[in-house]
């Protein structure tokens, strides 16, 4: 994957308290929740991220004492900019620094990922958390999500500017089709694995393999898998273009990614398609 950090952030104010519960205030929701770290998870979804980070740290041997916390920031909520990962990372940093827990950034990324799995119900990957914790200005991150090896690729398109549009269409991964898409991809992998050994995920699958066993897959499953396989190759081509300073080719690969997300993976929307069409027509 090839994520990058942006100039938006979530900020945490944090201090230990002498009580028996944690008090957490969300500026965005203007709501305070009391957390019992040895009790049930909270009913408010935003508070589950804080609770989950604490639980995942304690699973790894940390002792989390009661605290007071307030957080807010300028990362748009539900806009596809990984506000949940930013919150997990900020909370993780605050706890790690205050209590001297000794977790490194890779461990904090895994803690954030497992928070989503175990306390929010989203079987997410690790890209969003990794981008929040490892992103640097003027670079994108070429990340191998299996080994977690990564490389910072310079990103400085002279004469161009990257513009992020807010479609005003809100979503949450917890209530979106994310888990459905993941299950569809896993179904495709299972078909290929019946014939080809050593296949663990779609990164091990080629387009030829998919075409060979297409008849054993649901048509929708094939489309989902084909998008991922094609996107993996687009990423490699895009990185090669970046290393040459070829931002025209890089932009063409980005256009291909949008097309695949819209038509094959079907996770776009009319509003986003409208904005993409305007971008394509603009020199």
Language model: regions and residue ranges:
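C-terminal nucleotide
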Residues: 6, 11-44, 139-283
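ATP-binding N-lobe of GHMP and related small-molecule kinases
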Residues: 1-85, 89-105, 110-114, 119, ...
């Amino acid at each position: 994957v090839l994520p990058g950090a942006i100039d938006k952030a979530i900020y945490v104010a944090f201090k230990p308290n002498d009580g028996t519960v944690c008090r957490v205030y969300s500026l965005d929701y203007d709501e305070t929740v009391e957390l019992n770290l040895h009790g049930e998870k909270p009913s408010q979804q935003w508070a589950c991220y804080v609770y989950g980070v604490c639980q995942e740290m304690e699973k790894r041997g940390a002792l989390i004492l009661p605290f007071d916390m307030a957080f807010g920031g300028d990362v748009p909520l539900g806009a596809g900019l990984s506000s949940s990962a930013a919150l997990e990372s900020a909370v993780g940093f605050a706890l790690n620094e205050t209590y001297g827990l000794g977790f490194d950034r890779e461990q904090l990324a895994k803690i954030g990922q497992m928070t989503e799995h175990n306390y929010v119900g989203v079987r997410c990957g690790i890209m969003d958390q990794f981008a929040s914790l490892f992103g640097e200005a003027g670079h994108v991150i070429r990340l191998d999500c299996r080994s977690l090896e990564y490389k910072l690729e310079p990103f400085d398109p002279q004469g161009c500017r990257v513009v992020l549009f807010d479609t005003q269409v809100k979503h949450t991964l917890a209530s979106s089709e994310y888990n459905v898409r993941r299950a569809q991809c896993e179904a495709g992998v299972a078909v290929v694995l019946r014939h080809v050994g050593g296949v663990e995920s779609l990164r091990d699958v080629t387009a030829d393999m998919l075409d060979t066993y297409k008849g054993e897959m649901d048509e929708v499953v094939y489309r989902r898998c084909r998008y991922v396989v094609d996107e993996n190759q687009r990423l490699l081509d895009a990185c090669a273009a970046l290393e040459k300073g070829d931002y025209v080719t890089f932009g063409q690969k980005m256009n291909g990614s949008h097309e695949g997300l819209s038509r094959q993976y079907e996770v776009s929307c009319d509003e986003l398609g409208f904005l993409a069409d305007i971008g394509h027509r603009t020199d």
